[in-house]
Curated annotation (Swiss-Prot):
CDD domains: YqgF
Gene3D superfamilies the record matches: YqgF/RNase H-like domain (3.30.420.140)
Name of the protein: Putative pre-16S rRNA nuclease
Recorded GO CC terms: cytosol
GO molecular function (one): nuclease activity
EC numbers: 3.1.-.-
InterPro entries cross-referenced by the UniProt entry: RNaseH-like_sf, YqgF, YqgF/RNaseH-like_dom, YqgF/RNaseH-like_dom_sf
Subcellular localization, as worded in the UniProt entry: Cytoplasm
Keywords on record: Cytoplasm, Hydrolase, Nuclease, Ribosome biogenesis
One GO term of the biological process aspect: rRNA 5'-end processing
Reported function: Could be a nuclease involved in processing of the 5'-end of pre-16S rRNA.
Top EC class, one word: hydrolase
PANTHER family attached to this UniProt entry: POLYNUCLEOTIDYL TRANSFERASE, RIBONUCLEASE H-LIKE SUPERFAMILY PROTEIN
Amino acid sequence: MPDMTSASSGTVLAFDFGKRRIGVAIGEHELRMAHPLTTIDQSMTRPRFEKIAELIEAWQPVLLVVGLSVHADGTEHEITRLCRRFARRLEGRFRIPVALADERYTTVIARSVLEEVGVTGKKQRPMLDQIAAQHILQTYFDLSHAAS
């Protein structure tokens, strides 16, 4: 997996991985601004990767960023292993560099953002994961810019 400064230009896709849903965000490395894109609402591996392949074909990213889920103290748990596996699969299938990014509290932040604009309860579900992916990607951009 590349370091935080491996890509300096081009489109970047970010993923908030979950067992049932994957949030996707998009951004341009030069602008360093992330936007929510879509949520892949599918728990089966094959349909997930078919949808991801469609996104990659459409957007031609130079880098993929996967949020790495860990406990608040930084220790790993079951989902951490699944996030790493998902990242390896992305890199292997699509031959695009993949960076891992800390995703602690992204869902909490996404929920808060949606509540601020009046989206509550079950209405959040379609947007929550893509907003979390947006936060993952924005944090990646901010940290990679600070490192350069």
